[in-house]
C-alpha cells in the first residue's frame, strides 16, 4: 500500500485538475492510444477482485508496454502536469480542452514540461513496463476505447 505522504502528494498535484476551469477545445477527431504496442492488463470498467472479494470497477486502464518505446500524446493539448510522484511515478497530465484531460502514469522518463503544447502522437515520455491511463471529462472517467474509436457524445458534429 502507498504511504500517506505519497497519497497526499498525489491528491495535492492531481485532484485539483479534476475541477480546473475548462479551456477551449484543442482536439479534433479521435484520440490515439498512448502506447502503440501494448496489451491490456486491467481494462476500463473491469471489476477488481482482492482476496476473492469483489470490489469497485476500474476507472483507468493498465497496459503492459514495451519499455523505452514512446508514450504518445493521445490528442492535441497543453501539459498541465509533468513530474515524478511517489504514488504514480513519472506522470503526465494533458489538458485537451472542453474539460477533457488525459492522465498517464508510470512512465520510464518524461519528455515534456508543464505549460508545453503537444500535438496528437507527439512523444511525451518513454514507456516503462506498464502504463496506467485515465481519461476524464472533469472528474468523470471516460472509456478510452470509445475515444480511440471516435464514438460517443464527445464527438459531436460541429456546425460549419
What are these regions (language model features)?
Residues 73-108, 130-133:
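Zn2+-dependent peptidoglycan hydrolase active-site motif and core
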Residues 70-80, 112-127:
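Short, well-structured beta-strand-loop connectors
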Residues 92-93, 116-160:
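Conserved, short, structured surface segments that act as functional micro-motifs
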Residues 45, 68, 84, 97-99, ...:
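Solvent-exposed coil/turn segments that connect beta secondary-structure elements
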Residues 61, 69, 102, 110, ...:
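Glycine-centered loop/turn positions within well-structured domains
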Residues 1-88:
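Surface-exposed, glycine-biased beta-strand/turn segments
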Residues 98-121, 149:
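Short histidine-centered loop motifs in beta-beta connectors
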Amino acid at each position: 500500500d502507498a504511504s500517506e505522504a505519497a497519497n497526499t502528494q498525489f491528491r495535492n498535484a492531481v485532484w485539483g485538475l479534476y475541477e480546473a476551469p475548462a479551456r477551449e477545445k484543442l482536439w479534433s477527431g479521435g484520440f490515439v492510444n498512448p502506447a502503440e504496442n501494448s496489451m491490456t492488463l486491467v481494462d476500463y470498467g473491469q471489476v477488481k477482485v482482492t482476496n476473492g472479494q469483489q470490489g469497485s470497477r476500474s476507472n483507468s486502464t493498465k497496459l503492459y508496454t514495451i519499455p523505452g518505446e514512446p508514450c504518445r500524446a493521445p490528442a492535441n493539448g497543453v501539459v498541465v502536469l509533468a513530474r515524478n510522484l511517489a504514488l504514480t511515478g513519472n506522470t503526465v497530465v494533458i489538458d485537451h480542452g472542453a474539460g477533457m484531460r488525459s492522465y498517464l502514469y508510470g512512465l520510464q522518463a518524461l519528455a515534456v514540461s508543464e505549460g508545453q503544447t503537444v500535438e496528437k502522437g507527439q512523444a511525451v515520455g518513454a514507456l516503462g513496463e506498464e502504463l496506467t491511463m485515465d481519461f476524464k471529462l472533469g472528474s468523470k472517467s471516460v472509456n478510452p476505447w470509445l475515444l480511440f474509436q471516435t464514438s460517443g457524445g464527445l464527438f459531436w458534429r460541429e456546425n460549419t
